């Protein structure tokens, strides 16, 4: 799953993954991303992915337990992709994309995240532009989200339910 957390000023929380991460260390990514576990109903489709997202937002972003509930997350869509992290690891998943607009205090887990920041659309575009020329690396799934869904999400932050679809968008293998 991928969570896009926007504050009340419509800025998106992004994170730079910790250097110690096994897959995609040090890359910039969306607010929170991970995978459901085979526990407590997390394997059960959209609702299971929402439960996993809430668990990871508490664990990874340090959001106070119970502050965000699974029904606060707006399901947007799903995308299927493959992305090689290195010679050993590859992501191959159906990524459930969720969005939420809320002001929350965060206390990032340094084992998971080295930096966070809130960005507006222009600032995010500048970061992506730097990724093409500088030493800035962007998560491949985050690039897919930005290129295919994020503008529509940003335009509809006040009516997120109006843009959800039940498709699985086939993205293929990405670099």
Q: Which residues fall in each region the model found?
A:
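Secondary-structure boundary elements
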Residues: 6, 62-67, 105-109
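Conserved active-site beta-strand-loop modules that form the wall/rim of enzyme catalytic pockets
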Residues: 10-12, 73, 96
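Conserved Nudix-box catalytic region and its N-terminal flanking loop in Nudix hydrolases
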Residues: 1-4, 11-63
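A generic structural motif
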Residues: 7-9, 125
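Nudix hydrolase/Nudix homology domain
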Residues: 32, 75-175
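Well-ordered beta-strand positions
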Residues: 4-6, 117
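A short coil-to-beta-strand element that immediately follows conserved catalytic motifs
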Residues: 65-77
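Short, well-ordered strand-loop elements centered on a beta-strand within folded domains, enriched
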Residues: 10-16, 105-110
